Design a protein with these regions (language model features):
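A short alpha-helix capping/helix-coil boundary motif
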Residues: 8-9, 39, 85-86
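Phosphate/pyrophosphate-binding loops at sites that engage ATP/ADP/AMP, CoA/4′-phosphopantetheine
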Residues: 28-42, 109-110
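Condensing-enzyme catalytic core mediating Claisen C-C bond formation in acyl metabolism
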Residues: 1-30, 35, 72, 79, ...
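Claisen-condensing/thiolase-fold acyl-transfer catalytic domains that form or cleave C-C bonds
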Residues: 18-19, 44-129
Length: 129
């Protein structure tokens, strides 16, 4: 197991509430897969709390740089709630989106046997720009 640490990456939009979470989420998910000696396909779904479309795209790009392709099993709660129609590029509230999706459709699908192996990584901004 890795020691706890702070992940901070240089980026074009450091004050965006979602993009700072993406490098930390990438590090966490990469470490989890390594620790479990697993591949993304070993899970039914891998879900982040609320990176929104912008942060989710960055997460997938960062992990592809490490030869990890989450795209077949990856979803983001903020992106699921807001979709493409609402123009919420960076999603909403990490804790709100996480709770709504985890306690709603994800746990319901687990209870019904549609999801057996789930990775849920709570993400979202913890900052006040």
């Amino acid at each position: 197991m890795r020691q706890c640490r702070t992940i901070s990456a240089s980026m074009e939009r450091p004050h965006s509430p979602k993009t700072p979470s993406s490098p930390a989420a990438a590090d966490t998910l990469s470490a989890l897969l390594e620790d479990l000696d697993a591949e993304p396909r070993d899970f039914d779904c891998i879900v982040t709390g609320d990176l929104g479309h912008i942060g989710a795209d960055l997460l997938l790009t960062l992990l592809r740089g490490d030869s990890i392709d989450l795209s077949p099993v990856y979803s983001d709660c903020g992106s699921l709630i807001f979709g493409d129609e609402q123009d919420a590029h960076a999603g909403g509230s990490g804790c709100g989106c996480s709770a709504a999706v985890l306690c709603g459709p994800l746990l319901r699908d687990m209870h019904r046997g549609k999801i057996h192996r789930l990775v849920f990584a709570g993400t979202g901004a913890m900052m006040s720009p």
